[in-house]
Structure formats: C-alpha cells, structure tokens
Amino acid sequence: MGESQPVKTFDALFDELTERARTRPEGSGTVAALDGGVHGLGKKILEEAGEVWLAAEHESDEALAEEISQLLYWTQVLMIARGLSPDDVYRKL
C-alpha cells in the first residue's frame, strides 16, 4: 500500500502562513503575494474559485480536492493580508 501524506489542518496551514508573513523568507511565494496586496489576492481567489467549479463539473474527486486546497491557501493569505484570524471566520460559521 502507498504511504499517506500527513494531514495539514486549516489552523496548521494558517500558522505556517502567518510565520512566513512574519519571517519573510527570501523567495517565498506567500510573501510575494502579500506584497502584491489585496487586489491581486482577490483576483487569485476568483481564479481559484473558478477552477474549483470546473473541477467539480469535469474532473476527479482528487483534482477537485487539489483545487479546493488551493482556494483555501489563497483565502488564508488574504485573511493574513487583512489581519483576520481563523477565529474571526469561525465566529461567522
């Protein structure tokens, strides 16, 4: 049987991205996206949302999960750019 990859939670990803934003490692795509601002992040989220929709209509569950993970990543980067925490979002669920 193949090895399964470790599971990363929403909160663990947020902590990882927050640390990247704080330490600003050279060459980080997350840092570059944050430096690009909210407008660019919003455009990226719209792009990823469209890819989620298309994957849901035409691709495998695995491809859909991949697209959803990318949408979650970009949503979290936008949250960091705006100073929101997961708890800010959880209170709205």
Swiss-Prot record:
**Which GO biological process entries does UniProt record here?**
L-histidine biosynthetic process
Q: Where in the cell is it found?
A: Cytoplasm
The name this protein carries in UniProt is Phosphoribosyl-ATP pyrophosphatase
EC numbers, comma separated: 3.6.1.31
Under which main EC class is this enzyme filed? hydrolase
Entry similarity comment? Belongs to the PRA-PH family.
User: Which PANTHER family has this protein been placed in?
Assistant: HISTIDINE BIOSYNTHESIS BIFUNCTIONAL PROTEIN (PTHR42945), HISTIDINE BIOSYNTHESIS BIFUNCTIONAL PROTEIN HIS7 (PTHR42945:SF1)
Record-level GO cellular component terms: cytoplasm
GO terms, molecular function: ATP binding; phosphoribosyl-ATP diphosphatase activity
**UniProt KW Hydrolase keyword:** yes
Q: Which domain of life is it from?
A: Bacteria
Q: Which InterPro entries does the annotation name? A: HisE, PRib-ATP_PPHydrolase-like
User: Which keywords does this chain's UniProt record carry?
Assistant: Amino-acid biosynthesis, ATP-binding, Cytoplasm, Histidine biosynthesis, Hydrolase, Nucleotide-binding
